[in-house]
Amino acid sequence: MNLLIFGATGDTGRELVKQALAQGHTVTAFSRHADELTADFPTIKTIEGDVTDKATVEKAVQGQDAVLSALGSSSLKRSPALTTGVRNIVEAMEQYNVRRLVYQSSLGVGESRKQVGFLVRYIIIPLVLRNAIADHEDKERIIKQSNLDWVIVRPAGLTNGDHTGEYRSGETIDFGAKIARADVADFMLKQVTDDACLKKTPGVSY
């Protein structure tokens, strides 16, 4: 399949690229620094650009079979540019009839907030993570209001552990659970062809 990956130079994005190529997919990586990937992945196609540039996003989306997004920000401030980027991705996919979108969000967003413990729910999220959570909620809203075949993945606490292929997924994730980015990528790639979680927001953890 022709897969387009946004946020491909991030930790989860690189895992998506590596595993997608290993599975035989034709991968296009979209990133502001996409050239960083060519040394490690010589067969990859790259598009260097910013997701806020609608024309570049549209060009990238054309001809793809599915889109995966690992877009994220390390800042604790609001990131309206990423929300604009997700809107551009969704609109381009609708325009060019690319149906499947798999988006990485986070545990604690939306109704999954009730799954986290008291400290995280009432202190850490309101005081520390409120902007990051609000950004994810804005982006999820855009995706859910679209006519795409979407899956929003909400991983537990992320680690840089090994790719095991063994994890739990579903609507309920235990507070304090962890999962390696490599296994998040594994789960996300499965959603490209699996309809079980279509238009759902599964959590994923060990």
Give a label for each model feature:
Residues 30-35, 50-51:
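N-terminal Rossmann-fold cofactor-binding loop
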Residues 42-64:
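Conserved Rossmann-fold cofactor-binding substructure of NAD(P)-dependent oxidoreductases
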Residues 61, 65-68, 102:
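N-terminal Rossmann-like NAD(P) cofactor-binding module of classical short-chain dehydrogenase/reductase
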Residues 74-101, 138:
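NAD(P)-cofactor binding segment of oxidoreductase domains
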Residues 135, 153, 179-189, 200:
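Substrate-positioning beta->alpha
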Residues 140-161:
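Conserved beta-loop-beta element that borders a ligand/cofactor-binding pocket
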